[in-house]
Every structure is written in structure tokens, then in C-alpha cells.
């Protein structure tokens, strides 16, 4: 998967990009760890209220759903291996998974702006 640098307000991160059906379906499944300030960015062709789950994912994660303007719509904490879904509250073009608590530690949430997002 391609790797890019993103800016979430003042925080620099490195993100693997999942931009096709295969990479989006696999996501962070089976990963045992994430390096500090690393995550996975899911890129979609169309904006929609996408939902995610944690099947086969041993890491606790927080997901940020992001609109086409690069603004965080909402966050959701996701527990390892949980099969319940976490959905965007409004149409999203992107979703960013980071280690659980990363956004809270950096005081980021709904309305926070991302820079460096790729075009779908």
C-alpha cells in the first residue's frame, strides 16, 4: 500500500493508503502493532455514511470519518475483534484509523482539519 504524510491540525502522521476494495476490506486486520503516529487512511470514490468493524483486528483503534473538505465528521473508539459497526454520521470521503486514544491525546475531534489528503 502507498504511504503518505498527513497533517491533522498541528500533528504530523504517516498513513498507509487503502484506496481499492481489496485494501479497504483488509484494513488493519491481523496487525499486532502500529508505529507511533502511524495509521491507515481509507479513501473512497464517493461520499457516503460508511461503517467499519474490527473483525480479525487485534489492535484497539479510533476511527475518524472525514468529509470531502478534509474536516473530521466524528470519531469512534473500536475494540479489538468487535463485530459491531461504527459509522460516519454524515457522508465521508475518507476514514482514518489510529491507535485508540490518539485523537483525544492531541485534543482533536469533530471539525479538526486534515491536510495532504489524496484525491480519490
Residue ranges and their predicted role:
Residues 1-120:
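Compact, glycine-rich, soluble single-domain proteins
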Amino acid at each position: 500500500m502507498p504511504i503518505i504524510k498527513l497533517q491533522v491540525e498541528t500533528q504530523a502522521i504517516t498513513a498507509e493508503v487503502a484506496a481499492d476494495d481489496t485494501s479497504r476490506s483488509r484494513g488493519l486486520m491481523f496487525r499486532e502493532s502500529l508505529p507511533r503516529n502511524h495509521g491507515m487512511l481509507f479513501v473512497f470514490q464517493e461520499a457516503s455514511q460508511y461503517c467499519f468493524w474490527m473483525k480479525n483486528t487485534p489492535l484497539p483503534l479510533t476511527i475518524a470519518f472525514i468529509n470531502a473538505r478534509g474536516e473530521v465528521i466524528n470519531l469512534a473508539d473500536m475494540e479489538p475483534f468487535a463485530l459491531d459497526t461504527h459509522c460516519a454520521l454524515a457522508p465521508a470521503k475518507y476514514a482514518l484509523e489510529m491507535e485508540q486514544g490518539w485523537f483525544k491525546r492531541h485534543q482533536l475531534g469533530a471539525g479538526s482539519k486534515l491536510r495532504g489528503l489524496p484525491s480519490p
